[in-house]
Amino acid sequence: MGLIKAGIGALGGTLADQWKEFFYCDALPNDVLMRRGQKQITGRSSNTKGNDNIISNGSGIAVADGQCMIIVDQGKIVEVCAEPGEYTFDTSSEPSIFSGKFGESLKESFRTLWKRFTYGGDTGKDQRVYYFNTKEILNNKFGTANPIMFEVVNKRIGMSRTVQVRCNGVYTYVISDPLVFYSRLCGNVATEFTRDEIDAQLKVEFVDALQPALGALAEQELRPAQIPAKANELKAAMNDALKQEWIENRGISVAKIALNPITDRKSVV
C-alpha cells in the first residue's frame, strides 16, 4: 500500500470533489501532540456504513503545514508523510515516504520499523490515520529548586573555581521523529495524545540535564552571567545531554531556550 500525491489540478478543488472518502485534521493546538484523523464520507462512496477502522482504496488524505501523518495497520506503521499536500491511498502500490523537513532521519526510522512488519495483502481490520503536531510546543517553564555546581574556568591563567548557580526560564520542544514518538510513547490511541501526559516528566528530565549541559559550557570557559546570551550553545548542550532520553527514546528534541539571568551564586572552592 502507498500514497500517491495528487496532481496540481486536483489541488484546486475540495477533497469532497476528488475522493469518495477522505481524512484530514484541523490545525492542532499547542496542547495536542497527536490526533487521530477524521474520516469524511461523500455521496460517491459505497461505504455508507462508514467503518472508521478501514481505509478504502482510493481514499484521499490531506496533510497540512505543521503536521506529519502516518497510517497504521493493526497498530504497525505502514505509511508516513510529512509534506503538505493532498494524497490518494493506493493499496496496490509500494509504501511511500514523504519525509519533508525531517529528511533522511525519518526515512531511516521508517525502514527500521518496516522490517518488523510485512504486509500480506489482506485488508486490515484496524487501519487508522494519525496526525502529529510538528510545530514548536511552547511555554514550558522550568527552574532549579536546588543550586547547580558550575565550574568557572580560565585555562589561560590556570584558574578554576566552583560556584553554585540557580536558573529558570522557558523552553520549547518539537517532535523531531514522529515514528519514534508513536512507537515508543503514544501508540494506537483512540482519539488524541496531549502534552499534559508527558510534560511533568519532561520538565524533571530537562532540569536534570542542566547539570551536564552547563558543565559542557563551562568547558568552553563561559561564565554564568554569559550563558543567557548563549542560547544556541545551551540548546546544543541540552540536546546532547538529553540525546538518549528524548531524541532516541521519544523522538523529541529541544527547540529553543530562553534563560533568565542566573542568580544566587556562591563560591564553593
Language-model features: where?
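Amphipathic, coiled-coil-like alpha-helical scaffolding segments used for oligomerization/assembly
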Residues: 118-150, 203-262
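Conserved small/polar residues in nucleotide/adenosyl-binding loops
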Residues: 268-269
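Interfacial loop/beta elements and low-complexity acidic/Ser/Thr-rich segments
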Residues: 1-166, 172-197, 254-256
